[in-house]
């Protein structure tokens, strides 16, 4: 009986400590999330000089990034495997 009471009390203390630690982390979470969203948003504003996988392209022009080639059939950049 004493052992079960001790385990129950230890479990409650552990639950309290974990809850307090997660609550303090949650206070910082919204700030971190907003900073990451705005950092990604700033990155999207930059344009690349070449087109990546799945971007539409014009065959014959060198618009795709290195290791990609413009498919004359589908008219989008695909991985260039060579021949």
From Swiss-Prot:
Disulfide bonds join 50-65, 57-70, 64-77. One of its GO terms (molecular function) is sodium channel regulator activity. Coiled coil: none annotated. It is found in: Secreted. It comes from the Eukaryota. Residues 22-48 form a propeptide. InterPro entries: Huwentoxin-1, Huwentoxin_CS1. Its main location: secreted. Residues 1-21 form the signal peptide. The modification Leucine amide is found at residue 81. Keywords: Amidation, Disulfide bond, Ion channel impairing toxin, Knottin, Neurotoxin, Presynaptic neurotoxin, Secreted, Signal, Toxin, Voltage-gated sodium channel impairing toxin. Negative results: has no activity on Nav1.4, Nav1.5, Nav1.8 and Nav1.9 sodium and calcium currents. Monomer. The presence of a 'disulfide through disulfide knot' structurally defines this protein as a knottin. Belongs to the neurotoxin 10 (Hwtx-1) family. 15 (Hntx-3) subfamily. Selective antagonist of neuronal tetrodotoxin (TTX)-sensitive voltage-gated sodium channels (IC(50)=1270 nM on Nav1.1/SCN1A, 270 nM on Nav1.2/SCN2A, 491 nM on Nav1.3/SCN3A and 232 nM on Nav1.7/SCN9A). This toxin suppress Nav1.7 current amplitude without significantly altering the activation, inactivation, and repriming kinetics. Short extreme depolarizations partially activate the toxin-bound channel, indicating voltage-dependent inhibition of this toxin. This toxin increases the deactivation of the Nav1.7 current after extreme depolarizations. This is Hainantoxin-III 7. It comes from Cyriopagopus hainanus. The lineage of its organism: Eukaryota, Metazoa, Ecdysozoa, Arthropoda, Chelicerata.
């Amino acid at each position: 009986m004493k052992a079960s009471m001790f385990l129950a009390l230890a479990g409650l203390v552990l639950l309290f400590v974990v809850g307090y630690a997660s609550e303090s982390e949650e206070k910082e979470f919204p700030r971190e999330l907003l900073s990451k969203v705005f950092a990604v948003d700033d990155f999207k504003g930059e344009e690349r000089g070449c087109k990546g996988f799945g971007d539409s392209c014009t065959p014959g022009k060198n618009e795709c990034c290195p290791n990609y080639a413009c498919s004359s059939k589908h008219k989008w950049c695909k991985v260039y495997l060579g021949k």
